[in-house]
């Protein structure tokens, strides 16, 4: 699927702000794919569709997870996480993308997971550092991403985990497991 067609398919599902975010994620993912030797076309496609289900009805997504998806535990960790596994499902069913690499990158872009593929890492990080994102610590992660993909992911996870702890929010187990795995690999 070419870029124009993909963007045309995703745009009706997003607000203008989220569409601009998606463009930023796409451009960042392509840059990271070039830098780290990942498949640029897959990175582009996964980035374009990563938030495909972002604005779906929450009850509809909860029902989908309960009835058809394996990530049942995600239901206990906040509505912000639902769109990733549901997005992978909807992209397969509604858009017809069957490339499991692309679908996995969409599925885990919010939480991460241990043993992420290179493509999954790129989409996870591109979503965090795309140019429209402005929050404390993002510039450091952007700089780090140019030379150390895993280190940048660790930094993004530290920021996310710290943010959730300060808000007294639960942390999805795969997020902690991703942090632990990447940190232990660096030692």
From Swiss-Prot:
Q: Where does Fe cation bind?
A: 21, 50-51, 127
Cite the InterPro entries for this sequence.
Diverse_Catalytic_Enzymes, HD/PDEase_dom, HD_domain, YqeK
Q: Which residues form the HD domain?
A: 18-132
Q: Would I find Metal-binding among this entry's keywords?
A: yes
- Provide the catalytic activity annotation: P(1),P(4)-bis(5'-adenosyl) tetraphosphate + H2O = 2 ADP + 2 H(+)
- A Pfam family found in this protein is HD
Which SMART domains has this protein been placed in? HDc
Q: What is its EC number?
A: 3.6.1.41
A GO molecular-function term, please?
Answer: nucleotide binding
Q: Which UniProt keywords apply?
A: Hydrolase, Iron, Metal-binding, Nucleotide-binding
Tagged with keyword Metal-binding: yes
Residues bound to ADP? 21, 51-54, 83, 109-110, 127, 133, 170-175
Taxonomically, the superkingdom here is: Bacteria
What function does this protein fulfil?
Hydrolyzes diadenosine 5',5'''-P1,P4-tetraphosphate (Ap4A) to yield ADP.
Quaternary data: Homodimer.
Provide the family line: Belongs to the Ap4A hydrolase YqeK family.
What NCBIfam families would the database entry show? bis(5'-nucleosyl)-tetraphosphatase (symmetrical) YqeK (TIGR00488)
Query: PANTHER family given for it?
Result: BIS(5'-NUCLEOSYL)-TETRAPHOSPHATASE, SYMMETRICAL, SLR1885 PROTEIN
What is the protein's given name? Bis(5'-nucleosyl)-tetraphosphatase, symmetrical
**What's the source species for this entry?**
Halalkalibacterium halodurans (strain ATCC BAA-125 / DSM 18197 / FERM 7344 / JCM 9153 / C-125)
> Organism classification, top ranks?
Bacteria, Bacillati, Bacillota, Bacilli, Bacillales
């Amino acid at each position: 699927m070419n870029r124009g067609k993909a963007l045309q398919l995703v745009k009706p599902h997003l607000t203008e702000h989220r569409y601009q975010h998606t463009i930023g994620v796409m451009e960042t993912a392509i840059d990271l794919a070039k830098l780290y030797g990942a498949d640029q076309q897959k990175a582009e496609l996964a980035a374009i569709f990563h938030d495909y289900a972002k604005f779906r009805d929450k009850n509809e997504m909860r029902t989908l997870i309960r009835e058809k998806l394996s990530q049942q535990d995600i239901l206990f960790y906040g509505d912000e996480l639902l769109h990733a596994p549901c997005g992978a499902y909807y992209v397969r069913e509604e858009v017809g993308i069957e490339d499991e690499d692309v679908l996995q990158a969409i599925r885990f872009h919010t939480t991460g997971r241990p043993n992420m593929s290179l493509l999954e890492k790129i989409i996870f990080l591109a979503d965090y550092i795309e140019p429209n994102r402005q929050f404390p610590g993002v510039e450091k992660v952007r700089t780090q991403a140019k030379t150390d993909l895993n280190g940048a992911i660790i930094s993004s996870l530290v920021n996310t985990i710290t943010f959730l702890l300060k808000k007294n929010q639960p942390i999805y187990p795969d997020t902690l497991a991703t942090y632990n795995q990447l940190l232990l690999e660096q030692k």
